[in-house]
Structure formats: structure tokens, C-alpha cells
């Protein structure tokens, strides 16, 4: 059995990309194998989170690089099987550490952490819409300027996508700006994406109209999700991304057969 009562940016983007993918992840909750890219991102995020534990003048690239080993050890202790599967030998571990170092060097070309005192790091945020749907997720970093302006920061360990493929990340940041508004009645001043792989940033300043548009967009999307749940209409959508989807072997669009949909016992707004 499953309940559809909450939505995160990643699951929302899953549905936009492919309703069946959303179902298999959010309702069936089928396991997926770990990937090197995801693990590398988790490692770099952990190092950047801990970087701000150091005194301001010690937040250097040397301190960050020195934090790779301890962060990796903590992840290995938490999930030794995944680390052993992805990085079975010293050569693979060394390559991972070098890749992490390169990404961290990229971060230091984008800002000076010595001048920042984040208000929050890796913060779980949530807020409820009027229809009962809970919006939730994790914000990498929240900064508050002396004048009170709020900046939400998200680290991306990949490269900045071309404009036609930037919608997913843009929606994610608008989603968090909406959650901030709903929970604090405060308009976020700046949304900033740091693409460490390409050493570039994307900065946006949301308006009240942007917040209203995002809420309407999410409500419309949730209506589509609710209808799919009520009719069991989780249609697959073939795209070039199918080649990277773990569920391709059981996808009807590719000749597969998915398992029966688990019973859905509750849907927000219904």
C-alpha cells in the first residue's frame, strides 16, 4: 500500500519526465542500483557542508581537500556495500578522490567561503498547500545577508546544461522559494545554482508573480498525478533519457511489463 501526500522537486520532475517512472519510484519504491555520479555528488556535498564548521580563515581549498577522506569514511561506514560495489579497489577510490578534488577546486572559483556564515546547511524544509499536499525537500545552503535578504544555494556537481535542458533545475529552485514563502511569508531575494563541473553559476531573483506561478504549476501537476493514481494511468513516455533508466526492462514502451500497481490508500486533495 502507498500514500500520495507529499511531493519533492525530484519526484515532480520524475512525473514530468515519465509518469511511469514516478510510479515505480514513488509508489512501488523499486530499488535502483547506486551510480558513481550520485555518490560523487553526495561526497562533495558532505565536504562542502562540513567546510563551514571550520573558522572563516580556515575555509580554504586545502581544508576542503583534507575533508574528502573523512567524508568518504563516514559514507563508507553508513553504507559499506555501496562503496565496495562502486569503488572496489584503491585505484577506483583514488580516482573518486581526485574527481572530488577537481569539483571542490571548481567551487573555490565561484565564491569565497571565508566571507560567508550560512544560516542553514542541508536543511530539510516543508510546507503545506491549501489542498493538503506537503511540499518537502533539502536545501543545500541558506544565506542571510546583514540587511536580511535571503539566498538559497544549490550545488550541482555536473556541468551547466544548455538552456533548453535547464527547466528541471530552475523548477527545483522555484519550488524551494515557494516552500520558503509558505513557511515564513518571506520572499527569497536570490536563488543561486553552482555548477561545479563547469565552474559556472546561475542566479535568479524570484518575484511574487514567480511564486504564484510556481504554486499554480505544482497544483496543476498534482492534479495530473492524482488523476493518474485514480485511473491507474501511469503512461510511459519515451525520450532520449530512457537509455539511462533502470526501469527500461519492465517498461511497456520498450516491450516490458511492470508489476501491478500497489494499492494507493490516500491522495492529498482527494
Where are these regions (language model features)?
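Solvent-exposed, amphipathic alpha-helical segments
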Residues: 43-54, 224-228
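Hydrophobic (often cysteine-bearing) scaffold residues that line and stabilize catalytic clefts
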Residues: 36, 40, 44, 96, ...
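C-terminal, charged and often intrinsically disordered regions of DNA end-processing helicases
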Residues: 1-38, 267-270
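Metal-dependent nuclease catalytic regions and adjoining charged, substrate-binding loops involved
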Residues: 6, 147, 179-270
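Anion-coordinating catalytic cores for phosphoryl-, nucleotidyl-, and glycosidic chemistry
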Residues: 1-20, 125, 139, 149-150, ...
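Mg2+/Mn2+-dependent nuclease catalytic core
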Residues: 118-119, 123-218
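Short, polar/flexible loop-turn hinges at active-site or ligand-entry regions and domain interfaces
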Residues: 28-37, 54-59, 162-163, 232-233
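A non-catalytic, helix-rich entry segment at domain boundaries
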Residues: 47-121, 128
Amino acid at each position: 500500500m502507498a500514500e500520495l501526500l507529499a511531493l519533492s522537486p525530484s519526484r515532480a520532475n520524475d512525473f514530468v519526465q515519465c509518469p511511469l517512472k514516478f510510479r515505480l519510484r514513488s509508489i512501488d519504491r523499486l530499488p535502483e542500483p547506486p551510480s558513481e555520479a550520485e555518490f560523487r555528488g553526495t561526497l562533495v556535498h558532505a565536504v562542502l557542508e562540513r567546510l563551514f564548521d571550520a573558522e572563516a580563515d580556515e575555509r580554504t581549498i586545502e581544508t576542503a581537500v583534507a575533508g574528502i577522506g573523512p567524508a568518504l569514511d563516514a559514507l563508507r561506514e553508513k553504507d559499506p556495500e555501496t562503496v565496495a560495489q562502486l569503488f572496489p579497489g584503491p585505484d577506483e577510490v583514488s580516482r573518486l578522490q581526485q574527481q572530488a578534488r577537481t569539483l571542490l577546486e571548481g567551487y573555490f572559483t565561484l565564491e569565497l567561503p571565508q566571507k560567508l556564515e550560512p544560516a542553514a546547511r542541508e536543511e530539510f524544509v516543508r510546507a503545506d498547500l491549501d489542498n493538503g499536499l506537503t511540499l518537502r525537500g533539502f536545501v543545500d545552503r541558506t544565506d542571510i545577508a546583514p540587511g536580511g535578504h535571503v539566498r538559497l544555494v544549490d550545488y550541482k556537481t555536473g556541468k551547466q546544461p544548455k538552456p533548453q535542458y535547464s527547466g528541471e533545475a530552475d523548477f527545483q529552485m522555484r519550488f524551494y522559494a515557494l516552500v520558503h514563502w509558505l513557511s515564513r511569508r518571506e520572499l527569497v531575494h536570490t536563488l543561486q545554482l553552482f555548477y561545479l563541473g563547469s565552474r559556472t553559476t546561475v542566479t535568479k531573483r524570484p518575484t511574487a508573480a514567480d511564486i504564484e506561478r510556481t504554486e499554480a504549476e505544482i497544483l496543476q501537476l498534482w492534479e495530473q498525478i492524482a488523476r493518474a493514481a485514480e485511473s491507474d494511468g501511469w503512461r510511459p513516455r519515451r525520450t532520449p533519457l530512457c537509455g539511462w533508466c533502470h526501469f527500461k526492462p519492465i517498461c511497456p514502451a520498450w516491450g516490458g511489463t511492470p508489476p501491478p500497481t500497489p494499492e494507493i490508500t490516500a491522495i492529498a486533495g482527494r
